[in-house]
Amino acid sequence: MSKYSILFLFTVLFMFSCKNSNEKIEQVQKQEITLYTHRHYESDKVVFEKFEQETGIKINVVKASADELIQKLESEGKQSPADLLLTVDAGRLVRAKNKGLLQSVNSKVLDSTIPSYLKDEENKWFGLTKRARIIAYSKERVQPEELTTYEALTESKWKDKILIRASNNIYNQSLLASIIANNGKTAAKTWAEGMVTNFARVPKGNDRDQIKAILAGEGDLAIVNTYYIGKLLNSKNPVEVNAANAVGLFFPNQDNRGTHINISGIGVTKYAPNKANAIKFIEYLVSKEVQEIFAQTNYEYPVNALANTSELLTSWGNFKEDHLPLAKLGELNKAAVITFDEVAWDKGPNAQ
């Protein structure tokens, strides 16, 4: 072999060695995940920082509304840097799945930790935390013994008493979707009509506003998510604390299907460049320790049965959940939106 051939061989070997070294360095540097999230809670920031410290995996957080994130994933396609989509409401996760934006995940940890009704049957999304949609009532003007079910809110004794958000709110859409799933479309429409008749005002504001309106005497009942009560009770604003203290919590439908629940949930995106790390992150989020952080700081119920709830959540008592598979909320979302429109929900009691 000539000296030129030997030199060429060493050059090739050197370049190959450098290439492998660069690839290994690049792999080490890419110990990261990119998270598209709709959530905006301080608890999440705490959890993300703990994950980074414990694993060395960096989290690149991109925040926007759920609709914006789903649209972003669609437009980016195979070029998307996203590994995960985190949002509230199962219906949104179903929509992302139906658009082909999520992929199946194989994880013994997730299979054994998360109940089947709180996740996608193809493991394309998973519930991380639960929130119950309950009836908040004025402690001064309503006795809890007067309350029973969502359906009973249409009784005439509640005329001009009910406060609630507008129909474009995803929590209301999912509640109505659950009523359609359990009772059928005809009964659900009758319920929605009865609710409109009993509205105290035109639907407006967020869940916190409904609770404040009870304190202000604008109505006696409101349908809200439990974690908002926790946030108001722990607010630095005394007006919000007073509003939360003025209401009691009632978990409806305890003698039949149980109280409607919804979730914050997550899925691995279809073209996730860091799939293994993404799965590791989801497994971390449903661990006992992290689930208890969500319960303590964001007043959400754990999906992990081994996790303890916070003292506040425990004080509200145990309750029976509606175990309707949450995928149904997405499947019936369109029917719920149509029903709201048919009964003129947003025009309030004067519409009928």
Would you name each region that the model predicts?
Residues 15-17:
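C-terminal motif of bacterial Sec signal peptides marking the signal peptidase cleavage site
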Residues 80-85, 103-137, 151, 161-164:
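A structural signal for short loop-to-beta-strand junctions that line the ligand-binding cleft
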Residues 93-101, 118-148, 177, 261-267:
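Periplasmic solute-binding protein
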Residues 20-95:
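Early extracytoplasmic/lumenal segment of secretory-pathway proteins
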Residues 264-324:
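Mature extracytoplasmic/periplasmic domains
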Residues 311-352:
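Extracellular/periplasmic bilobal clamshell ligand-binding domains
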Residues 178, 183-251:
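Ligand-binding pocket segment of bilobal, Venus flytrap-like solute-binding proteins
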Residues 36-39, 121, 137-139, 145, ...:
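Short beta-strand->loop
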